[in-house]
Amino acid sequence: TGIKVNLINGKAGALEKRMIEEGADSSADLYITADAGRCGAFKAKGMTQGGLTSAAIKAAVPANFRTSHWAGIAKRARIVYYSPERVSGAELAGLTYESLADPKWKGRLVIRKSSNIYNKSLVASLVKNNGKAATAEWAKGVVSNMARTPKGNDRAQIMAVAAGEADIAVANTYYLALM
């Protein structure tokens, strides 16, 4: 196309700080980040312009993955990793995020801290689908089912299952491939 692209990459927080400090003088035309939660937070800080009305984007990106301020161009899922030696197929049948609060998982679950952006996005989706009260009860159930206090990144959760510290873990799909 002949369009010159100047790519600046780094940690999301550092890039966001830079663009906020630059304000209207920022040369950034496009910000690509790893999570819809970050897009919403960035919008809340007034750092998006809106007006995303491209027919091509509307045709290619389903409505639930875009707003007038941002569009999802990739999808990653928070999934449940499990130990096939300690978790039966019957236990996994019908497994949902909501069922992670079931007492049958007591002492068997690991997940990152609730302050992690991926978990914030998961909780936001549960609030949207199930309401605040149901999600608050779900969170209490998940906490009571934890095998240990949350620590480490997504890979640490997967490794905890492999090490026998837990039977199931919630982590993003791509982390296993990075291990």
Per-segment meaning from a language model:
Residues 1-5:
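Short alpha-helix C-terminal cap/hinge motif
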Residues 6, 10-14, 27-165, 176:
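Extracytoplasmic ligand-binding site segments that recognize negatively charged/polar headgroups
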Residues 17-24:
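Short, well-structured alpha-helical segments in soluble
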Residues 168:
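Secreted/periplasmic proteins that engage bacterial cell-wall peptidoglycan
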Residues 172-179:
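A beta-strand-loop signature enriched in Asp, Gly, Thr, and Trp
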